[in-house]
Amino acid sequence: MSEEYTEKFKEAKDKILKAQSLNELEEVKRIYLGKQGFLTQILRSIGKMPQEERAKWGRLANEWKEELETLYENKERELKYLTLQKKLEGEKIDITLPGRRKILGRIHPINQVIEEIVTVFKEMGFQVVYGPELETDYYNFTALNIPSDHPVRESHDSFYIDKEHLLRTQTSPVQIRVMEKKKPPLRVVAPGKCYRRDMPDATHSPMFHQIEGLAVDTDITFAELKGVLTIFAHRLFGKERKVYFIPSYFPFTEPSAEMYVECGVCKGVGCKACGYSGVLEILGCGMVHPEVFRIVGIDPEKYTGFAFGMGPDRIAMQIYGIDDIRLFYENDIRFLKQF
């Protein structure tokens, strides 16, 4: 029996030293040092040995166990080092390779267009002002001469928070706030977000941007309004693009008009972006209604003014040749990185 155990001990040492992987080493440990290993068998059989043999085999088993565990730990350390070296060799960075450039953030195309528009009007003497996105029914509708029974005031067209508050449907309330606080002459533009219950399609979004413009002074005429907006259109789109003014109706202006420009996507031929009409509405405008002046305490007999409101989202579509407004809001980096 002593020869058998001695051979097992030598065999265990040999297999530990020759192990080529951590898995192989772990298997050797299980066979020789585990619960069913030969050292455990020796310790279990000591009780059956003659009295004079027990001390000898007990001491020998503990010495062998200590030696094998030391060998195992050394071999494990060696194999872990070799495994790590092999892994590092495979993952070694070649410093001669070109580095990867970080993707830089960019200003959103709609914000770029808003900045361009605002810059044009600032150069014409307009001041930039802002107002709250959460508005009262008074500023959003009543002060703008919109009748109480007008469809736009219904909940199916607007996002009401409660009976008196809603997400503004236009940036026009800003002009009311400005006229309440400041005296003419006034020239302001008010960019910002607006909200309406529109189903998303190629030209509509429930959240969109608008820039409101207002000028108030003595002797302002519709001809001045047309001149300012024509200069703006030519600065933004180029003098080769045709501009059209078509009579329209808005409760807060009289007379009123809509300004159209030749579609930049199809060059006037007709496409999805312009509803196959060849032109695209850019803004609504008109002379400030006398009733609006009365509401804010400005004498309509002394002062006149014009107002306009435009959608930078649609203008961005024209500038960049985009035929679907939804692309601006999908956060697709492949699309946004083009601007």
Swiss-Prot record:
Cofactor: Mg(2+)
One Pfam family cited in the UniProt record for this chain: Phe_tRNA-synt_N
Keyword Cell cycle: no
Top-level division of the source organism's lineage: Bacteria
Alphabetical keyword list: Aminoacyl-tRNA synthetase, ATP-binding, Cytoplasm, Ligase, Magnesium, Metal-binding, Nucleotide-binding, Protein biosynthesis
Main EC class the enzyme belongs to: ligase
Annotated localization: Cytoplasm
Cofactor binding description: Binds 2 magnesium ions per tetramer.
EC number(s) on file: 6.1.1.20
InterPro entries assigned to the protein according to its UniProt record, in alphabetical order: aa-tRNA-synth_II, aa-tRNA-synth_II/BPL/LPL, Phe-tRNA-synth_IIc_asu, Phe-tRNA_ligase_II_N, Phe_tRNA_ligase_alpha1_bac, Phenylalanyl-tRNA_Synthase, tRNA-bd_arm
Gene Ontology MF: a single term: tRNA binding
NCBIfam families in UniProt: pheS (TIGR00468)
Family: Belongs to the class-II aminoacyl-tRNA synthetase family. Phe-tRNA synthetase alpha subunit type 1 subfamily.
Protein name as it appears in the record: Phenylalanine--tRNA ligase alpha subunit
Organism for this UniProt entry: Dictyoglomus thermophilum (strain ATCC 35947 / DSM 3960 / H-6-12)
UniProt gene name: pheS
